[in-house]
Amino acid sequence: MSTTDTIVAQATPPGRGGVGILRVSGRAASEVAHAVLGKLPKPRYADYLPFKDVDGSTLDQGIALYFPGPNSFTGEDVLELQGHGGPVILDLLLKRILALPGLRIARPGEFSERAFLNDKLDLAQAEAIADLIDASSEQAARSAVNSLQGAFSARIHQLVEALTHLRIYVEAAIDFPDEEIDFLSDGKIEGQLNGVMADLEQVRTEARQGSLLREGMKVVIAGRPNAGKSSLLNALAGREAAIVTDIAGTTRDVLREHIHIDGMPLHIIDTAGLREANDEVERIGIERAWNEIEQADRVLFMVDGTTTDATEPAAIWPEFMARLPATLPITVVRNKADITGETLGLTKVNGHSLIRLSARTGEGIDLLRDHLKQSMGFTSNTEGGFLARRPHLQALETAARHLIQGHEQLVSAYAGELLAEELRLAQQSLSEITGEFSSDDLLGRIFSSFCIGK
């Protein structure tokens, strides 16, 4: 991981556009300016200049911006050239810059990586840049901006600071056991620990919301042929995404639709009807259906209400329930309520959710949308929220587990040394979110998923 050479990349998307931007970062940025512009622009002022080739001919003309380090995005000297967005022009300008000594193409995410390494961003803020670019809804974008501005990092730093303060008390109790006041047994440390655990649980709740905003919920519609699975997909999507006929086995492959329910991304997957396959193509489709089911966050078990009065999943189709992963949440959807005359609504049957609706007429679909949102614990229009990734949730869970174990050591045995170690491990897990304890390999994987010009 070299940060001594100077990097260049296109910061705007590939293809034609009104404006195309090349970004340069590193110690040779000023040399690039002199070579291409004939001068070094005044720092942080827009300068309209021709962009020159090696022979002095004009390649393009546009705006040049120069940001001397450390007062730049990366913390290094940065030069931005904003010209016309034609791919040929940008390619010629890029080749011109790369012909200079010490210049190379940036790796994906390397600008953000350098900003992180130069303490311009912490890891959570750097990841928020990619999340903002990838945001699929207004609420996700707003939460990504909050993360970029440090909302998530600030919550983590507060927890780390509280743990540091708590560790001081614990270490003092260990090092000075003969003092008049025993911090381990007088309840003070336990009270502070309970407070940190409560704060951490609140951050975990908000982080789960942020993870849902970023990654969404994967819902698989499964059931026998002709149960109305494709009709339900179309009803949820609000368009004719799947072919619907009265012929059993019309859907032969996996169909995917991406929608939003009050800001929560929902990945709906329609699958082939589950039965004994009639041919090789259908067999492959059914295998793919089971693969999707096993990876789902929730399964909508589609039942044709005209074929059975049963409401208990195991009574409807015991073989299907036997093959489902035991921990996989399911919602039984009794379809065709417009024909059976069943009352629309959501009920519980032996711990499983059951909803009666009509995918054909759309009756009960709004109820299903609300159910999906509530089943994931999603709250829309959360003010001041932040985005979170699965590794963030894992780090928060690990920290919570260490605090629980430390609390057990404290209340059962006043074991200061064991409590101190659990507090240290919890603090380390939290610091991984902001990058203070991240390995180079982990950082490489994170930043390689970014855009080239970021």
UniProtKB/Swiss-Prot annotation:
Uppermost EC category: hydrolase
InterPro entries: G_TrmE, GTP-bd, GTP-bd_TrmE_N, GTPase_MnmE, MnmE_dom2, MnmE_helical, P-loop_NTPase, Small_GTP-bd
Sequence positions that bind GTP: 226-231, 245-251, 270-273, 335-338, 358-360
Endpoints of the signal sequence: none
Chain residues that bind (6S)-5-formyl-5,6,7,8-tetrahydrofolate: R23, E80, K120, K454
UniProt GO cellular component terms: cytoplasm; cytosol
Keyword entries, A-Z: Cytoplasm, GTP-binding, Hydrolase, Magnesium, Metal-binding, Nucleotide-binding, Potassium, tRNA processing
Subcellular localization(s) per the UniProt record: Cytoplasm
Similarity section: Belongs to the TRAFAC class TrmE-Era-EngA-EngB-Septin-like GTPase superfamily. TrmE GTPase family.
GO molecular function annotations of the record: GTP binding; GTPase activity; metal ion binding
Biological processes per GO annotation: tRNA methylation; tRNA wobble uridine modification
PANTHER family in the cross-refs: TRNA MODIFICATION GTPASE GTPBP3, TRNA MODIFICATION GTPASE GTPBP3, MITOCHONDRIAL
Comment on bound cofactor: Binds 1 potassium ion per subunit.
Gene field: mnmE
Record EC number: 3.6.-.-
Residue ranges of every copy of the TrmE-type G domain listed in the record: 216-377
Residues that, per the record, bind K(+): N226, T245, I247, T250
Protein name: tRNA modification GTPase MnmE
Assembly notes: Homodimer. Heterotetramer of two MnmE and two MnmG subunits.
Gene3D superfamilies found in the cross-reference section: P-loop containing nucleotide triphosphate hydrolases, Probable tRNA modification gtpase trme, domain 1, tRNA modification GTPase MnmE domain 2
Required co-factors: K(+)
